[in-house]
Amino acid sequence: IVEINKCLLAENKINEVIKLIPSLNIINGEVIIRSSYKDEVLIIISTNDNVEISKIKDIKNLKGIILNNKTIYKDNYFIEEVNDIKYNVAYDAFFQVNRLVCAKMFKLAQDFVNEGDIVLDLYSGVGTLSLSAARKAKEVVGVEINKNAVDNANSNAKLNNLTNALFIYSDAGDIKNLDINFNKLIVDPP
């Protein structure tokens, strides 16, 4: 492990927060910094050390702090927007980190679908590819094993008025047990 003050691949807001990490006094643990298109940040900390949270509560656009899977300050999610679709993203849910690449991927998912298609999206996460496809498809069903991501995906469908998208909590390996008829499949495994 190498201590850094800046990551050239990270967004500016993340680099601002990186500079404050040493003030948390974490000896053994992990800190994850997530940022949104609005420059909001979530800070996720996993450690048994006593953490000096007061050192980071005043960060501009701080959306929330999660310590050992418990929300201890503000929210445990942020809102992301790609190609005019908004996504609630829980702190532990996957979301593409490169917005330019993900915008192209989401557009490809939408272009892949025709009106009348019934789409099954395995490993659907918070609904990123599913909701893009739902703009054209007759129906989209997303399958995801992370319960928070499924909840986010269903609320994201409502948030974007996409009534033709439904997300279910299940292991993608169990789809043979699900009664879903589809003619298009999206697979974006972890």
PLM features per residue range, with description:
Residues I1-I4, V41-I43, V89:
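Short small-residue beta-strand/loop micro-motif enriched in glycine and branched aliphatics
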